[in-house]
Regions:
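Short, Lys/Arg-enriched, disordered terminal segments
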Residues: 1-4, 305
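ABC transporter nucleotide-binding domains
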Residues: 3-4, 11-206, 211-212
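Short, surface-exposed acidic/glycine-rich loop or hinge patches that mediate macromolecular interfaces
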Residues: 67-68, 125, 210, 235, ...
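ABC transporter nucleotide-binding domain
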Residues: 174-266
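C-terminal coupling/interaction segments
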Residues: 267-305
Length: 305
């Protein structure tokens, strides 16, 4: 069963078409990474899922119920964490969760039980200081606790790790990974390492439509390519090798960093023969040669070219 289904969705702002015939399915129980560059339309899509923005065309269903602009019926299934969550800074975490619980009609007993459990989940149990004194990472964790208060079927997180330091990012990702068995998670990001760490499904938004989608393993198997890292003793050697390899049809791209070059090819075995022959003919001896596994980053860079 799909918790979220999007069919032929389109949205324009003036003459600029942001979303173009977008199709997306989020399976129940998945941790779904929604990838795209800044400005690709990820937040616009999420706002339409929440009924906060009206699509020009297409249909959105949450738990098989249609989403209607301006109505909140389907939001009973959704927990939402915006990219910059806002709070009442004079409150403590438990006071804020109590207020949110009362708004959705939970009893005091349930609020107390859930509040303590969720604060423990996000590592804020025992924190008595006011929210205004929280770090950005602590506020993100409190935002997740609030979004989970009503036991949503779908948790939507908009760039939850984008402004955090490495420790804060790890804390958020650990929380999202922990809840994967009870809640479907959809989170948008442009940090590809976060997706590779916890996601089992991925969709790459580019130019308003889904360019690549599926399970992470399927995408890597079908769409990515092998890469070979070659390190030279000098940049002059690298440039000499680069000039010799410039017209090779087996190569689909390369990247340079200092004295290193990463070469991409869909036929790496054949490419390796060409590479080593070129090295021998040019009398070049690299200090390091290593075969690299396909990565989501290399696929992303290939798609957005």
């Amino acid at each position: 069963m799909n918790v979220l289904s999007i069919c032929n969705l389109s949205k324009s702002f003036g003459e600029q078409k942001i979303i173009k015939n977008l199709n997306l399915s989020v399976p129940e129980g998945s941790v779904f990474g929604f990838i795209g560059q800044n400005g690709a339309g990820k937040t616009t899509t999420m706002k339409m899922v929440l009924g906060l923005l009206q699509p020009d065309e297409g249909e959105i269903r949450v738990c098989n119920e249609p989403v209607r602009f301006g109505q909140t019926k389907t939001n009973q299934y959704i927990g939402y964490l915006p990219d910059v969550p806002e709070f009442y800074n004079y409150m403590t975490a438990i006071q804020y969760l109590t207020l949110c619980g009362e708004i959705v009609g939970l009893s005091k007993k349930i609020i107390s039980q859930k509040g303590q459990r969720l604060l423990s989940l996000v590592g804020l149990d025992g924190v008595e200081k006011r929210i205004g004194c929280y770090s950005r990472g602590m506020k993100q964790r409190l935002g997740i606790a609030q979004a989970l208060l009503a036991d949503p079927k779908l948790l939507i997180c908009d760039e939850p790790t984008s402004a955090l330091d490495p420790v804060g990012r790890k804390e958020i990702l650990d929380i999202l990974y922990k809840i994967r068995g009870t809640t479907t998670v959809l989170f948008s990001t442009h940090i590809l390492s976060d997706v590779e760490r916890i996601c089992d499904h991925v969709a790459l938004l580019n130019d308003g439509y889904i360019a690549v989608g599926g399970t992470l393993s399927e995408i890597k198997a079908l769409h990515s390519h092998d890469s070979l890292l070659i390190e030279f003793s000098s940049e002059a050697d690298l440039q000499q090798f680069k000039a010799s390899m410039a017209k090779q049809p087996l190569l689909i791209g390369s990247e340079e960093k200092g004295r290193e070059m990463i070469i991409h090819s869909r036929e790496m075995k054949k490419a390796q023969h060409t590479i080593f022959s070129t090295l021998a003919e040019a009398d070049l001896a690299p200090v390091k040669v290593a075969l690299m596994e396909p990565s989501l980053e290399s696929l992303f860079l290939e798609v957005i070219k």
